[in-house]
Amino acid sequence: MNASCAALWSLGSSRMATRAQFESSNEVGVFAKLTNSYCLVALGGSEHFYSTLEAELAPHIPVVHATVGGTRVIGRVCVGNRRGLIVPSITTDQELQHLRNSLPDSVEIRRVEERLSALGNNVACNDYVALLHTDMDKETEEIVQDVLGVEAFRATIGKQTLVGSYCHFTNQGGLVHVMTPVEDMEELSQLLQVPLTAGTVNRGSDLVGAGLIANDWAAFCGMDTTATELAVVERIFKIATRNQQKLNLVDDLTLRSSLIDTLS
């Protein structure tokens, strides 16, 4: 970890995950994309949404207002990490130039031709590894590896091919949808080299990739996210307060059991 990342981690380690809402939607991962070097947010949200994110992020990384292909579902159509950002072919030249002008110079931006154009639904990544939809083009896989500087693997999350919708992981840990078999979760954890846990957001939604955004030192979930769900997010992404960091394995199993009971 470099000095700047260490400083950000130090700042973020005592914070809690924050609830937020884009207009009337709790799917914050649909309207925003958060990495360790930038945050993209859709146009047209409330001032409260922007101020909530900027209060946590703006002192450390740019919070950039943008559209992709004229849409606001920016979190679902692009994929990125601290090194790069990949956008679909529907991205206009003007939008591309705005992103290049707004993001740090160290971030490479690439526009790709891909049949599975909702890249955020079909790819999940951190700064080291990416999981891809099993049917993604080979050329796109190579671009993901090149631009983001990651190892790329085709995978499913508990039989779900939309890996970007059903999981979210950072360099600290990851959340997968609650019906993911334990053996699958263990295999993915080994592959990603980060701890994983199963959970939900927004009061039982298993679309965790759509319902939250997180990096190595901050996380934002929809307003409907319960205290139990929030506790899971804070622990697995290692952004909990010191008291919450004292949770042990028994606590984790209790939280998982509570989530499963809620869904049954």
Curated annotation (Swiss-Prot):
Coiled-coil residue spans: none
InterPro entries: eIF6
Subcellular location(s) per record: Cytoplasm; Nucleus, Nucleolus
Main location: cytoplasm
UniProt keyword annotations, A-Z: Cytoplasm, Initiation factor, Nucleus, Protein biosynthesis, Ribosome biogenesis
GO molecular function, one term: translation initiation factor activity
GO biological process: cytosolic ribosome assembly; ribosomal large subunit biogenesis
Domain of life: Eukaryota
Any GO CC annotation of this UniProt entry: nucleolus
Subunit structure comment from the entry: Monomer. Associates with the 60S ribosomal subunit.
General function of this protein: Binds to the 60S ribosomal subunit and prevents its association with the 40S ribosomal subunit to form the 80S initiation complex in the cytoplasm. May also be involved in ribosome biogenesis.
Protein family: Belongs to the eIF-6 family.
Protein name per Swiss-Prot or TrEMBL: Eukaryotic translation initiation factor 6
Taxonomic lineage of the native organism: Eukaryota, Sar, Alveolata, Apicomplexa, Conoidasida
Gene: EIF6
